[in-house]
Amino acid sequence: MSLLTEVETYVLSIIPSGPLKAEIAQRLEDVFAGKNTDLEALMEWLKTRPILSPLTKGILGFVFTLTVPSERGLQRRRFVQNALNGNGDPNNMDKAVKLYRKLKREITFHGAKEISLSYSAGALASCMGLIYNRMGAVTTEVAFGLVCATCEQIADSQHRSHRQMVTTTNPLIRHENRMVLASTTAKAMEQMAGSSEQAAEAMEVASQARQMVQAMRTIGTHPSSSAGLKNDLLENLQAYQKRMGVQMQRFK
């Protein structure tokens, strides 16, 4: 795996699924391929994106700044600086300075990532802030190692939280989660339908599922009643995809 592919993989792992993720993936590909060279416009676009957390925007802004060639005097952006200040915690800043001194002696991507993984996400973000604000300089490879370690720390905590939700025994949370999954599966079916022959059938199944979820939310139902809805919908989607020759993997 090339360095830029690895960076793209780690950065995208912390962005919630949806149309915005696809859009960001495209921007990253363009930036890494040297097709997008207007850093100012790129940062303005990033600043106004909804859904993304300030830290995610800060990390993306850092990656864009590292990759897109720009004039030396180009102003640093406040939204990136604020996101990469380690929540203003002096403890994070102290650790960031210690980490920076170690990274300064490092020259490889993997070496930098390895060193960085023993620090908290707050300290890692602060260290990125030091480099972003030109208070310290490291090689681009080392900076990317720092980025990937930060994303890994964030993705780990997101995964733990997701796993807790999936394995929860609280019937109300499980019920709501099944209904949300049914809604997103319905949306996926509608998007895939396009102009194929089976489009009408897919749209019909998706529409029924949406109405069912709406009704369940409006009148309230027993928490176990949504299990069948989600399973039926996934079976319908699988059958539809088989006919279309599309792999199911993407929706598991």
From Swiss-Prot:
Record function comment: Plays critical roles in virus replication, from virus entry and uncoating to assembly and budding of the virus particle. M1 binding to ribonucleocapsids (RNPs) in nucleus seems to inhibit viral transcription. Interaction of viral NEP with M1-RNP is thought to promote nuclear export of the complex, which is targeted to the virion assembly site at the apical plasma membrane in polarized epithelial cells. Interactions with NA and HA may bring M1, a non-raft-associated protein, into lipid rafts. Forms a continuous shell on the inner side of the lipid bilayer in virion, where it binds the RNP.
Pfam family, one: Flu_M1
Bilayer topology: Peripheral membrane protein
Subunit architecture: Homodimer and homomultimer. Interacts with NEP. Binds ribonucleocapsid by both interacting with genomic RNA and NP protein. May interact with HA and NA. Cannot bind NP without genomic RNA.
Family as reported in the entry's similarity comment: Belongs to the influenza viruses Matrix protein M1 family.
Alphabetized UniProt keyword annotations: Host nucleus, Membrane, RNA-binding, Viral matrix protein, Virion
Renumbered residue ranges of the record's region Membrane-binding: 1-164
One cellular component (GO) term of this entry: virion membrane
SUPFAM superfamilies, sorted: Influenza virus matrix protein M1
Note: Most abundant protein in virion. When expressed alone can form virus-like particles in transfected cells.
Location within or outside the cell: Virion membrane; Host nucleus
GO biological process, one term: viral budding from plasma membrane
Region: RNP-binding, residue numbers: 165-252
Motif Nuclear localization signal positions after renumbering to this chain: 101-105
Protein name: Matrix protein 1
Example of a GO MF term: structural constituent of virion
Main location as per UniProt: virion
